[in-house]
Amino acid sequence: EFGNNPYNIDMPVGTDGKMDPDAKLNYWGDWRNALLKSRLRQEYTIDFSGKNKKADYFISAGYLNDKGVFSIQRFERYSTRANLNYNVNKWLKVGTNISLSHSVREGSASDQTVWLLRTMPTVYPIYEWDSATNAYRLDKNGNRIFDYGNYRTSWSGTNPLADDTYNKSPWTHDDVSNRTYFEITFIPGLKWRTNFSVDFYQYNYDGYVNSEYGFAAGYKGSAYKESDRNLSYTINNLLTYEK
């Protein structure tokens, strides 16, 4: 069942089983071009480094904006890193390495989306088609209304473009990592080193599903929030001797 006749005549297939040469498609459900896009990937990095007789350092910062090939996904990340090693005197050396990152991911393109592109017939429109007027239906703002295809025999109630427009699902990630050490040389070849590491991870997910269209319309939409924090640390002490 098409739900709507996609052709400009009532009987596009004759009694002989052949297509009527006058039959033309009113619309073309071009899901592939709607979902797959050639989009810009931007990545920028900058770094500084230096050293002298007692110390060396390295500092870097980066920005990534990767929209991917699917029009329904976005990813953005800010990151920075700093590394310092310092010889306090002949027998003591200290150092630290710290990295921070903040990223936001919204939308997703799962295996289900790929399978939809492979199997969704083009006779199923992306937007609702009005057979009476031979035009797409418009909302009160003059925008085309997405077709969730509740009449379809496959992919019923599915429209990833509509979900991306009406629903929001941003994931926010924050990561902090630090490695610090001090090293004592007692005699040539005999060293004591203490390493201390700290890792902090946090993510937040804020989901919103609209109340007007899609699977949540029947129960007036939904909203939910999820978050998690994790802090871990490790201390180890090493005594080594090399001839």
What is each of the regions a protein language model found here?
Residues 47-49, 60, 83, 179-181, ...:
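Outer-membrane beta-barrel architecture
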Residues 41, 52-53, 89, 185-189:
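Outer-membrane beta-barrel channels and translocator barrels
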Residues 58-60, 95:
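Periplasmic plug
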Residues 40-46:
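Solvent-exposed "coupling" segments
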Residues 1-27, 38, 68-75, 79-177, ...:
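Surface-exposed loop/interface segments of Gram-negative outer-membrane beta-barrel transport/assembly proteins
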Residues 50-54, 63:
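A generic beta-sheet turn/junction motif
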Residues 29, 34-35:
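C-terminal beta-signal and adjacent terminal beta-strands/loops
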Residues 61-67:
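Transmembrane beta-strand segments that form the barrel wall of outer-membrane beta-barrel proteins
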